[in-house]
Design a protein with these regions (language model features):
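Terminal presequence/propeptide segments associated with secretion/organelle targeting
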Residues: 1-175
Length: 175
């Protein structure tokens, strides 16, 4: 059994058989697909650190209480203690907006290790290697093809042995 982190875009052909043997009922395509709806489209990041779940076609999401605690607290008053009593909007007009809160969906995940490490082997010092990696990442973030409303971020995995580029879409109208 392989341990550690399983990157969704690499499940197909890499971990799918093992996951099926462990009892998984869905396919790797059901978990991650760029071309069809998949689990990645239903589990966005909530405010950069928490997971959330989309549970309606209108964008209703759920997350853990502690993830939205600050926003709940900011809307609470002595008369309306939402932390104690909860809150239920009966219409869209009653929903309470939350400034500086966003929900981010992954559009695609791509392995860009070759591009990030391009030219690094020819360098001798760790400082030179680090500077070139940072330059390559910066160039990729600027030039990677995406829609105007999408963001690109590159994350390192396995202690700098793999680099993955995430194309994301963020929504800031969270109520």
């Amino acid at each position: 059994q392989q341990g550690g982190m399983w990157i969704p875009s690499l499940l197909n052909g890499m971990n799918e058989t093992e996951m099926t043997n462990l009892g998984m009922k869905m396919s790797a395509e059901d978990i991650y697909s760029v071309n069809q709806s998949s689990l990645k489209d239903a589990v966005p990041h909530f405010n950069g650190g928490c997971t959330s779940e989309v549970i309606s076609p209108n964008g209703l999401i759920l997350t853990n209480h502690h993830c939205g605690y600050g926003e709940i607290q900011s809307h609470s008053t002595v008369e309306n203690d939402y932390l104690q009593d909860g809150f239920w909007a009966k219409s869209y007009a009653e929903e309470l907006p939350n400034e500086d809160l966003e929900v981010t969906f992954i559009v695609s995940i791509n392995d860009v290790t070759k591009e990030v490490l391009n030219g690094v082997d020819a360098l001798k010092t760790e400082g030179e290697k680090k500077a070139l990696i940072e330059k390559n990442i910066s160039n990729l973030q600027k030039t990677y093809k995406r829609e105007d409303w999408q963001n690109v971020m590159i994350r390192t995995f396995y202690e700098g042995n793999q680099y993955m580029l995430f194309v994301t879409e963020s929504f800031e109208d969270v109520r």
